């Protein structure tokens, strides 16, 4: 029996509970693709073939099987992944769910639009769409249904905070989040955004002078000049360390905490790095079809969820030091899970039989270095607050 058969059987048990498979063979192929991705560490159908345990003798047979799966119109990505991620979030608990939306360009030809759930310094995919589009900027109409689909997958009654970068700063989005989905939001906006203050001439965010360490909080104002929207709240600051300017719009009253909350958005960029240069090497893929790429993202999403949960369980079981050389946690949960799976293959360890994410507070937050942690505590701000609420 191949060493990978144990992982195959465990994934078959975890993923096979869903009744959405049009053909159970589609599930079997998907599992071998996930195993190939984890074991090879890269996107390569040819490199995945060596890890398959089946009656087929030739590598080309496995490669063709994977390729057919990626281009099979019967493989409905969201219908297959929805029950998996819904079950993964079902035991989240009472903690706030932080969702992050972002885009990633592939070969300057395809745009991957994704909504992920923030999880302990990284992010796990919830829903996505791949379109042929030569820009990372997309209109609200393009991703509106993606947000609606995400809403259906979350636990009923969950408190949600949504975050996105400047490319998503649209009043249509803000209204949709508040009125249709019932989510809170923190969105970074551009410095040319118009701010309307009662009794004052409309001005742009760039007109507010900010020295290093200055922060301005504007509560209850309106934004945009042509079609005023609000009331919203704004947080403006110039970072005393990086010297960067930050402009955040929120549906809730802003404070210095708003900047820390928005900073969590960068966890999705770490997720994209895990899929690209820092992990699975997505950009090495030879797939050049939006629909096939979306199916490939399903393979990535399941691998990410599986490894992250394995890492979560490793820490919870008190076994982190078996796979992490740092005194304090220095690796992501995905990386810890990846190392644990290697131990399963080569040292006879056992997999943890779950795909559920825990919303509990991280008891072992990652520390890049003591110097980095200390530097983040050196930020000091001088805050001015203005309220325009009627």
Question: Model segments located where?
Answer:
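Short, basic alpha-helical nucleic acid-contact segments in DNA-binding proteins
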Residues: 69-83, 88
């Amino acid at each position: 029996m191949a060493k990978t058969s144990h992982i195959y059987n465990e994934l078959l048990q975890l993923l096979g509970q869903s009744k959405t498979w049009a053909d159970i063979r589609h599930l079997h192929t998907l599992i071998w693709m996930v195993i190939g991705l984890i074991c090879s560490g890269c996107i390569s159908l040819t490199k995945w073939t060596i890890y398959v345990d089946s009656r087929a003798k030739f590598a080309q047979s496995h490669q063709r099987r994977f390729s057919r799966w990626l281009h099979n119109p019967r493989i409905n990505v969201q219908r297959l992944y929805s029950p998996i991620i819904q079950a993964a979030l079902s035991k989240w608990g009472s903690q706030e769910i932080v969702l992050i939306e972002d885009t990633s360009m592939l070969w300057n030809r395809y745009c991957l639009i994704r909504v992920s759930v923030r999880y302990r310094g990284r992010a796990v995919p919830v829903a996505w769409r791949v379109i042929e589009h030569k820009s990372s900027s997309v209109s609200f109409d393009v991703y509106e249904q993606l947000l609606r689909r995400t809403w259906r997958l979350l636990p009923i009654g969950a408190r949600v905070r949504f975050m996105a970068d400047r490319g998503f700063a649209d009043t249509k989005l803000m209204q949709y989040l508040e009125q249709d989905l019932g989510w809170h939001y923190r969105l970074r906006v551009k410095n040319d955004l118009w701010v309307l203050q009662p009794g004052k001439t409309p001005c742009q965010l760039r007109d507010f002078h900010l020295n290093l360490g200055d922060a301005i909080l504007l509560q209850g104002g309106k934004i945009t000049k042509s079609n005023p929207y609000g009331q919203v709240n704004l947080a403006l600051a110039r970072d005393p360390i990086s010297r960067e300017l930050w402009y955040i719009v929120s549906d809730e009253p802003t404070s210095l905490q708003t900047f820390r909350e928005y900073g969590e958005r960068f966890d999705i960029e770490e997720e994209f790095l895990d899929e690209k240069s820092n992990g699975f090497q997505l950009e090495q893929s030879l797939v050049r079809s939006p629909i096939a790429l979306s199916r490939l993202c399903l393979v990535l999403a399941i691998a990410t969820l599986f490894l992250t949960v394995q890492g979560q369980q490793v820490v919870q079981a008190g076994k982190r030091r078996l796979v992490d050389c740092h005194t304090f946690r220095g690796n992501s949960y995905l990386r810890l899970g990846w190392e644990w799976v290697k131990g399963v293959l080569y040292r006879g360890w056992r997999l943890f039989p779950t795909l559920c994410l825990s919303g509990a507070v991280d008891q072992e937050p990652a520390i890049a270095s003591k110097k980095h942690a200390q530097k983040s505590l050196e930020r000091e701000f001088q805050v001015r607050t203005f309220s325009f609420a009627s």
